[in-house]
Amino acid sequence: MKIVIAPDSFKESLSAVSVAACIEKGFREIFPDADYVTLPLADGGEGTVDVLLQGLAGQKRTHQVEGPLGALVNAEWAMLEPSEYNQNKTALIEIAAASGLDLLKPEQRDPLVASSFGTGQLILEAIEQGAQTIILGLGGSATNDGGAGIVQALGGRLLDSKVQDDDGQELNRGGAALAELASIDLTGLDSRCADVELIVACDVDNPLCGDNGASHVFGPQKGATPDQVLILDKALANFAQIAESQGCVGGDDPVHKRTGYGAAGGTPMGLGLLFNMQIKPGIEMVLDVLQADEVLKGADLVITGEGQMDNQTLQGKTPYGIAKRASLQGIPTIGIAGSLGTEVEALYGEMSSLFGTVRSPQSLDQVLQEAEKNLTRTARNIAATLKLGRKILS
């Protein structure tokens, strides 16, 4: 029996590699002689660089940048060697490495002031090192600033409405400040940006603004209160309106409605002012690089998972992506999550069954501390149930 274990990370607790190891350990208690193939995955969020380096030759590097609240952090990125996949000198960057939620303690999270400036510094470093193409993974950000910090780091000026001279004053960093935006000055932008191809690996398809936009859907997990969600949504809408009125963005469709622009607190909004940008589903990119379709051939079962599965999983997350690939080959998929959330039943179209690992009410700290034990136990119990089913049917 061939079992492919292809999970994402469990946010704030286990890496994708650790998740795969726990699942294999649990299954081996029941099926010790099965053929196990582990395929740790990512969809543009945390761990994307490490996962892509499984299939592409490259070197990891470290650069000191400003974190989401300004404190210095050592952020990892990678430069790829030329290959069939990447003809140009290509950099791999995660927004989570410089502007990530995991860089802050829960009580520090504040999307009103958190900035993507450090991610802009990483992009600038990659350009300095000769990158012609940049693959930027969006996911796990602490920010809701529409990529404004990136614009500022690369030489753009965002000017407020409190005019003290003809130009106005530069905005403070953070999402809330965008409510005061009156004009955008890109004359000081690093000229090399025009020659860089930017590929955004995105794990959601939400628009920039509105009830399904960046602030309403993802703001609360970054620390936003209901009132702050409204402030942030209006601020992003103002950013989009100013950019459109000044002709800073191309295309006929309204910026605030564009698919994927709600990723990472609206980061594609700012990126679109600076680069020749393509937005691609991060999981599809990762699956192609790792030749997942070949790995799946001959498999009897796929097991995937992430920290939480809910209706957002359908919008470009790892479990749904690998389950669709498995379904095309007639392979059943089982999903394991720390918790099963809103409208998770929608996943039954691609997954045979879903399991949560938390068995009793616990504090978040306790859930995170016991993630490895809970996951291994759940995997073991799933395997035991499968074995019982085979016995009953034989």
Residue ranges and their predicted role:
Residues 1-138, 142-394:
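N-terminal loops that bind phosphate or other acidic moieties
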